[in-house]
């Protein structure tokens, strides 16, 4: 649609404008026009869209023709070793086929970061960073996942604003993505950097690295980033440039592979407490649905 094309054009222009404030040579191309070979001429590629697939999605069938497995499209060869920053769900899009840990835990990341590693290089330089932080109530959804945590979920956490807008306050705003934290750092080629306000655990990965890929889960265009976040984003680009040629060597092809945390979750879900919580949640969901139905019916009668 015309609106979608304009949105993409505006985002592309905003990224180009912001990056030129920090870097000498910047080339902007549409994701569908990009090829892996193009990245060899640049220190870092920032991927904010879906590139052309090098292998389409396909279904695996048994001898009788029954579908036994679904395989996602592949967008990069496993040999790709150039530094790349992926924005929001793009980390899952380009990463699933090559076993990246930036998988789709939840498309629910909003505008603020928390539980960041303050000592990490992206918060230090080379561009000077100022971080305005404030204590805020813990995201309510985190309490639903308290059984994952070794310590009680705190009532409040330090927050840092990454975006001036978010989907919770601005209807229709693009939503960010967090990756699963479990096993994220079980190999030296991956590191957790920050979490963010989302509907999952307090350690869900909003910013993280796996090999030569850096997942920036926040979805905002630079036009809606805070000035502080723009600087950290630029530092993230510099940081990932260090990992040229360093492909992931521990890959995760099954995003739902069982981990110790999975066992912990199954144990909790078998308790009466979990059942009561689910009943309450279902009742609240049903009540909200009836409320929305009533609103729609009233509009239809007008």
Cite the ranges covered by each PLM segment.
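Helical hinge/lid and interdomain linker segments adjacent to catalytic or ligand-binding clefts
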Residues: 2-96, 275-280
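Residues at the C-termini of beta-strands that transition into short coil/loop
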Residues: 32, 88, 126, 196, ...
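Short low-complexity, flexible loop/linker segments enriched in glycine and/or proline
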Residues: 42-43, 100-102, 260-261
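An acidic, glycine-rich "communication" segment
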Residues: 86-188
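A structural signal for well-ordered alpha-helical scaffolds and beta->alpha junctions
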Residues: 8, 12, 115, 119, ...
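Extracellular ligand-binding/catalytic regions of CAZymes and related secreted enzymes
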Residues: 175-177, 185-302
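Extracellular/periplasmic catalytic domains that process cell-envelope and extracellular macromolecules
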Residues: 37-40, 77-80, 115-116, 185-186, ...
């Amino acid at each position: 649609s015309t609106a979608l094309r304009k949105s993409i054009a505006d985002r592309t222009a905003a990224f180009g404008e912001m990056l030129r404030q920090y870097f000498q040579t910047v080339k902007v191309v549409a994701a569908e026009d990009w090829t892996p070979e193009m990245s060899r001429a640049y220190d870092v590629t920032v991927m904010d869209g879906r590139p052309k697939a090098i292998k389409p999605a396909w279904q695996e069938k048994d001898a009788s023709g029954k579908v036994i497995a679904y395989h996602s499209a592949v967008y990069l060869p496993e040999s790709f070793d150039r530094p790349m920053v992926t924005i929001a769900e793009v980390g899952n899009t380009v990463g699933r086929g090559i076993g990246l840990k930036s998988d789709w835990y939840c498309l629910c990341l909003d505008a603020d970061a928390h539980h960041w590693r303050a000592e990490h290089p992206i918060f230090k330089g080379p561009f000077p960073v100022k971080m305005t932080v404030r204590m805020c109530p813990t995201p309510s959804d985190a309490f639903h996942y308290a059984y994952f945590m070794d310590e009680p979920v705190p009532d409040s956490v330090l927050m840092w604003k990454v975006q001036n807008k978010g989907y919770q306050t601005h209807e229709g705003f693009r939503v960010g993505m967090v990756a699963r934290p479990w096993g994220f750092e079980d190999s030296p080629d991956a590191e957790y950097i920050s979490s963010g306000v989302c509907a999952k655990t307090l350690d869900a990965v909003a910013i993280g690295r796996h090999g030569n890929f850096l997942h920036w889960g926040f979805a905002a265009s630079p036009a809606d980033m805070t000035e502080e976040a723009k600087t950290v984003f630029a530092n993230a680009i510099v940081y990932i440039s260090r990992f040229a040629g360093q492909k992931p060597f521990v890959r995760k092809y099954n995003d739902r592979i069982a981990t110790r945390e999975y066992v912990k979750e199954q144990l909790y879900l078998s308790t009466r407490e979990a059942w009561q919580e689910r009943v309450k949640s279902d009742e609240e969901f049903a009540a909200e649905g009836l409320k929305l139905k009533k609103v729609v019916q009233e509009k239809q009668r007008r």
